């Protein structure tokens, strides 16, 4: 995906655990039948629920579902909003069945660095894929954070094949904010990443450049089935080996 793409970070607030399951089922149907098709111009569709080690498949008492959708252009994003069969129908069902406790939150972000995926094996169809979401606010500038992260991205790319995604996003409306999405093959990949000396070093550097504690700004999630991340559009068969953002 090029620098002119647009990402939509979504936060959904289902009214109950049962309604959360209903939302996920509806979303997964759309992922299979719409978002993977060429007309969607969607390069990533990753939805996730809170990671709970003791009950990996359960949903929290106050359920929340988050997701990242990436489109090739703003026009592609608008096309899916206008789609009557999947997007608009989904929201009709949400309203009819009172699936949400409160309105969803949608925030637009723009690719700024890192990589979206590595190869076809990293398309999110595996079980157990974990996702970390970190929101950072720089003390001075976004570029300060990028200066710290760029060398680390290179290290992750070269040495951590089980880190499927390491994607950095910016937001013009909040120029000092940075969104970091990292997808891991499994718990082992997450553990190895967090315990690496290089990770410890980059966290220390970021801590000095951030307004708040980075450890309090990161949440961990488990990716739902039917999520996918690929470079390019269409049926997912045409992908770069290293999809740079």
Language-model-detected regions and their locations in the chain:
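Short S/T/G/P-rich N-terminal loop/turn motif that feeds into the first structured element of a domain
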Residues: 1-245
